[in-house]
Amino acid sequence: MSTSGVLDTINTHLASVTNPTPQVVVRGEPILLNASPTFAYWIQSHSEDFETLGDRSTSLSVTIRCYWRLEQAQQVKEALELEVYNAIVSIKQKLSADALLGGNCQYSICGTADTGYIEQSGITFKIVTIPFQIDVYSEETITP
């Protein structure tokens, strides 16, 4: 079990979403959004759950965020809402189907997806944010 394996597996699952297909998947919060949709994920927090005599088990909170460049036409906005919904369902299905993330964690679960808007470089983007909680047992070895 490893955090790097967790992150690699999340990347693989996000890249394999086909409805909608991301133009790019970014590990880390994107600085510049050139493609739509862009799927990104990053570590939000890391904490110790419990400790034994030989190791520590941890919880990792990952933020998954999808970005769509917003268009002005009403028909495009209506189609976008369906694409946003499909992205939420597809991402949650991919991650739930592999709750152990390829054997790299003990358990994982998606939280409630939120939608909203952000502006970057004068361009408005529709966003979906999905919190993702991961438990990694025996992640840190304690040596006496």
Residue ranges and their predicted role:
Residues M1-L33, S45-P144:
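Charged, amphipathic alpha-helical segments and their flanking helix caps
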